[in-house]
């Protein structure tokens, strides 16, 4: 049974994006449409949404039916969206990184360790599947991926077990992979499922999620209007580090001309952002209690100067 989709940190997203009537916004990760719909309901603005998952098109068509020319949908991954956007510029851009609740709740997509299904994990349905990777990768490569993208302490033990098991029979379902991981770690009461980190790591690797994020950030300046805002919600320490470092490297620096002068802004042509979140915003305890998927979320925002 699918759980209702609850957009993560929705109020914070609206606060920092600060939508206004007549302005245009880019929702880079449409998913179930929570952010797009909230923006459209907030004021008389325009939203363009992106997603590489063909399964979300029906939801996009529903929003298009309700909001007509105020909403457009483009089937593409956000890392390669620039040509398809045809030189459009936006007053605000939002990214909600990671997997959507819809993808997690459909067993056939192969994202969830809670539901047995084909071991797929591809957001677009194209390219290398998790099953192919799990059954063909070298033990060292498996361990490296699980450690790097999952922060999994037991990565080598898990990789070794995967190689042992696949010699006897192909690992072709999420249930089989989850059981292998659990057998290596074991359950601890009150802790997250032992398979969480491994599934996250494989999903990030299969979909090149970090590479796509870096590619988008490298080009986002070209589609963000002056004073436009960029809001990013991440769910993994590596994602957050990429966003944090990008904001820092491209932000204006306050510089005091002398110890007697007031602090002044020295603008460098290479510095085009002003950070508007002093530190990463995190969900409230209330939101986490209502939506456990929000527990690891972090939101950062900046403005183009």
Curated annotation (Swiss-Prot):
Pfam families: Methyltransf_5. It catalyses: cytidine(1402) in 16S rRNA + S-adenosyl-L-methionine = N(4)-methylcytidine(1402) in 16S rRNA + S-adenosyl-L-homocysteine + H(+). GO terms for molecular function: rRNA (cytosine-N4-)-methyltransferase activity. One of its GO terms (cellular component) is cytoplasm. The gene is rsmH. It is found in: Cytoplasm. PANTHER family: 12S RRNA N4-METHYLCYTIDINE METHYLTRANSFERASE, S-ADENOSYL-METHYLTRANSFERASE MRAW. Keywords: Cytoplasm, Methyltransferase, rRNA processing, S-adenosyl-L-methionine, Transferase. This is Ribosomal RNA small subunit methyltransferase H. Specifically methylates the N4 position of cytidine in position 1402 (C1402) of 16S rRNA. GO terms for biological process: rRNA base methylation. It comes from the Bacteria. Its EC number is 2.1.1.199. Belongs to the methyltransferase superfamily. RsmH family. S-adenosyl-L-methionine binds at residues 33-35, 51, 78, 96, 103. The keyword rRNA processing applies.
């Amino acid at each position: 049974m699918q759980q209702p989709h609850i957009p993560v940190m929705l109020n914070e997203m609206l606060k920092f994006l600060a939508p206004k009537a007549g302005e245009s916004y880019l929702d880079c990760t449409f998913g179930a449409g929570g952010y797009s719909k909230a923006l459209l309901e907030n004021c008389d603005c325009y939203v363009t949404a992106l997603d590489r998952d063909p399964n979300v098109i029906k939801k996009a068509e529903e929003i298009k039916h309700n909001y007509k020319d105020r909403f457009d949908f483009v089937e593409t991954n956000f890392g390669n969206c620039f040509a398809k956007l045809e030189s459009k510029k936006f007053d605000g851009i939002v990214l909600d990184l990671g997997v959507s609740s819809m993808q997690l709740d459909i067993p056939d997509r192969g994202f969830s360790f809670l539901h047995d299904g084909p071991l797929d994990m591809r957001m677009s349905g194209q390219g290398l599947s998790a099953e192919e990777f799990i059954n063909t990768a070298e033990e060292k490569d498996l361990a490296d991926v699980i450690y790097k993208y999952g922060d999994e302490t037991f990565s080598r033990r898990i990789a070794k077990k995967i190689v042992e098991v696949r010699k006897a029979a192909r690992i072709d379902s999420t249930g089989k992979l989850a059981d292998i991981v659990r057998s290596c770690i074991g359950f601890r009461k009150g802790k997250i499922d032992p398979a969480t980190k491994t599934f996250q790591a494989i999903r990030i690797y299969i979909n090149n999620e970090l590479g796509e994020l870096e590619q988008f950030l490298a080009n986002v300046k070209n589609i963000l209007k002056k004073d436009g805002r960029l809001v990013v919600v991440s769910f993994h320490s590596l994602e957050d580090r990429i966003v944090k470092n990008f904001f820092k490297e491209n932000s204006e620096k306050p510089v005091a001309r002398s110890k007697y002068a007031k602090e002044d802004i020295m603008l460098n042509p290479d510095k085009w952002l002003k950070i508007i979140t002093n530190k990463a915003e995190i969900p409230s305890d209330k939101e986490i209690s209502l939506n456990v998927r929000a527990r690891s979320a972090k939101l950062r925002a900046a403005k183009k100067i």
